[in-house]
């Protein structure tokens, strides 16, 4: 299922052809109705959820391309001693992540961002986790951010060197008992990752 978050509100659909987002395809799709539904949902904050059901995945992809500017990002869930690394960013519980730079692959960007935001080095990717999607209004342009997530480990241990220029004030570890508290204090899009995180903790 495709889920796109706007703060605590969610757009969801059963079908989504993500590959079409990166293709300059001139194919004409009948996506105007979906575009209008998305825009109505974005500007009407009284709508908590927009469920597009079994909409054609290609039509939805073209609608997303029409409505949003794309800003891909990548991040990591770092496991240390059966705990995971979290950060406090602008007062919210978060995971280390950031924009993918030109020429970078998501995995390389994730390793770089985690090290920059936490100070943790010698990182190794174990496997890929589900991506999250959220959107926001920036300079009068709706932007969609797909964040590619990776499960990681390190042989150098925990460090607490927050990247303060990015609004990060704290780097800390959370065990399985602390997951519920993290979930209360984090973003709606990240809550979808919690089951995967729990599976990674013994």
Predicted regions and their residues:
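Conserved beta-strand and immediately adjacent loop positions that scaffold enzyme active sites
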Residues: 75, 83, 170
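Unchanged
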Residues: 99-190
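N-terminal leader/capping segments at the start of a protein or of a new domain
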Residues: 1-43
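Charged phosphate-binding loop/patch that engages nucleotide di/tri-phosphates or the phosphate backbone
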Residues: 189-202
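Acidic, metal-coordinating catalytic segment for phosphate/diphosphate chemistry
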Residues: 32-75
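Conserved Nudix-box catalytic region and its N-terminal flanking loop in Nudix hydrolases
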Residues: 21, 28-29, 79-115, 120
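Short hydrophobic/aromatic beta-strand or adjacent loop that forms the aromatic wall/cage
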Residues: 1, 73, 145-149
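Active-site beta-strand termini and strand-to-loop segments that position acidic
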Residues: 78-81, 152-154
